[in-house]
Amino acid sequence: MSQAMQPQRTSPSPDAAIAPARARGGVWQLINRSGIVMVFLVLFATLSLTVPDFLTPRNIQGLLLSVTLIGSIAVTMMFVLALGEVDLSVASIVAFSGVVASTLITATHSVVLGIAGGVLAGGAVGLVNGVLIARWRINSLIVTLAMMEVVRGLAFITSNGDAVMISEERFFDLGGGSFLGISYPIWSNIVGFVVFGFLLRKTVFGKNVLAVGGNGEAALLAGLPVMRIKITVFVLQGLVTGFAGVMLASRMSLGDPKTSVGLELGVISACVLGGVSLTGGVATISGVLVGVLIMGSVQDAMSLLNVPTFYQYLIRGGILLLAVLFDQYRRNQRRAMKI
């Protein structure tokens, strides 16, 4: 007649079930935001303690000056990668723009014309890249790999295979002058990071770039001008890289068609180390800045330690591989958080 009392079963609360996932997500977000900064701080502290003369004011200023070339191009490479594309032609654009600027200055003695010609030459290459990629829908890796060879060839043709010497001393002020004790190339980097950081995070254009990189088909269905956005980004990449080439020619006092070989790998490594996703849709200007400083610190330390060139290739390649692996790890974590 009496029934045995059954123990009452209680199902776990939904909030309790998702709490560990939220905790993991919070930890991952903290690592994702500050992890690369911690890596840089540990690296910088280690190099300061182990590498002679690394922390001297003169070397720090030299380090900042040495990363200006990578840094100036990384601010726009960030946009290219955020689209889910890539640009391997930047090193050739640097050489070509420097040669064009040097040739024009030597022929006309006009510094303004030379600078404008070099920058526009870079912009023209960027326009060709953008049209082929966005309008004709050719893979950006193939397009920019081909343009890397074409533009390098144009640099050799324009200079007849030799470096073009510059005699206009006014042109040297662009790369060698300073303001408030800080050289113009460093100032140009500061301006570049501020302007393009603002463009990425505070403007409709920047948000559209991230939207296109995150899901191009959805962006197209939402009415975004995907083709125009991609072409604009590649033109910006060309113009900024052209200016970087002109600045480098000013620092070297010549336009060299053989300069900056392999530069594109350093730029891409800095961006990926800084959290820019190779599949698009994710980018932060602060992360790119830290990535640039990491690349510069490693290169500076290798120079101070007189590391042989062939070992430097090995180390730079290893950094790029680690950056790609880290990017893959971040993507896996983002997928896990969405499940």
From Swiss-Prot:
The keyword Cell membrane applies. One of its GO terms (cellular component) is plasma membrane. It is a multi-pass membrane protein. Keywords: Cell inner membrane, Cell membrane, Membrane, Sugar transport, Transmembrane, Transmembrane helix, Transport. GO terms for biological process: L-arabinose transmembrane transport. The chain crosses the membrane at residues 35-55, 63-83, 88-108, 113-133, 138-158, 179-199, 204-224, 229-249, 275-295, 306-326. Disulfide bonds: none annotated. GO terms for molecular function: transmembrane transporter activity. It is found in: Cell inner membrane. It comes from the Bacteria. It holds the Pfam family BPD_transp_2. CDD domains: TM_PBP1_transp_AraH_like. InterPro entries: ABC_transp_permease. The keyword Zinc does not apply. Part of the ABC transporter complex AraFGH involved in L-arabinose import. Responsible for the translocation of the substrate across the membrane. The complex is composed of two ATP-binding proteins (AraG), two transmembrane proteins (AraH) and a solute-binding protein (AraF). Belongs to the binding-protein-dependent transport system permease family. AraH/RbsC subfamily. This is L-arabinose ABC transporter permease protein AraH.
